[in-house]
Amino acid sequence: MMARPGYRKFHGFKSTVFGKSIPRKYLLDYAQARELAAEFNTLVEDGGIGLLIGEVGIGKTTAIRAFKEELGERSCRVCYVGSVKHSTAVLQDFVLQMGYQPSHQRANLLRQLSKAISQTWVEQRKKTLLVLDDAQATEESLLEDLRLLSNFDIDSQEPLILLLVGHPSLQNRLRKPIHLALWDRLRMLFRLEGLSLEETHQYIEQHLKAAGGPVELFTPEARVAVFEQSQGIPRRINRLALEAVKRSARNKVNTIDENMIAVAAGVFDGV
């Protein structure tokens, strides 16, 4: 049996702390997350195309995962492609998730996807949500294919919902003349921002709770220092806080203060 990492044993954590994902019940419930959830729900209800943007590590994928879990398979079929791939590979991935054996020809893939979306609506009365993450790196031709795919309707309903997710540069890209037809069809545009100071306090506490550790491990001053170094970006918070936790265990220190945060930040030359 693999031994627990030293910090888990020293601080009494039951699981990894400040990891990439935590159980949904521990996700921070804050104003911006609630606003985004409302936008997601409206998009699914009304159909159409949505755009979610934010800096690297801001929590876009986490927000999508939480919404997908909440949505389940009740009224919508969700297909997610999250890594940068060639446009044909993206379409093949979507087709495979819809339950079809994907073709090797692009035109056939679009027909397969269109048929699967229509069939899901007609037979199950379920819409299909296609989520394309890291869309800022997507080929121009794929964006156009997805726009054309979203054109059809059945019984005055739009059975396809398309959600593009990416860096802020994606918004500028979609506003170029080549993609204006897609831009004009957007029904949702949401930019995810970093956490506030108070939200950063709560975020740290939620992660400590999720791992079963001491919620007072970080002093108030340390939490302020984490916020200042990370700018409230969750991935940076996680990296900095975990480094501080590991160092505190190695030094057999039961409380993390702002000085330890400064040392931890130096490892990454800031975060």
Description of each model-found segment:
Residues 1-46, 266, 270:
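A short, basic N-terminal segment
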Residues 2-6, 65, 181, 198-205, ...:
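C-terminal alpha-helical "lid" subdomain
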Residues 8, 86-93, 101-145, 153-158, ...:
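Mid-core helix/loop region of P-loop NTP-binding domains shared across ATPases and GTPases
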Residues 45-66:
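Walker A/P-loop nucleotide-binding motif
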Residues 50-53, 80, 131:
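Short hydrophobic/aromatic beta-strand immediately N-terminal to the Walker A/P-loop
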Residues 68-70, 170-185:
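Short regulatory helix/loop adjacent to the ATP-binding pocket of P-loop NTPases
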Residues 72-97:
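AAA+/P-loop NTPase substrate/partner-engagement loops
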Residues 81-83, 174, 187-200:
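Conserved AAA+ ATPase "SRH/arginine-finger" region at the nucleotide-binding site
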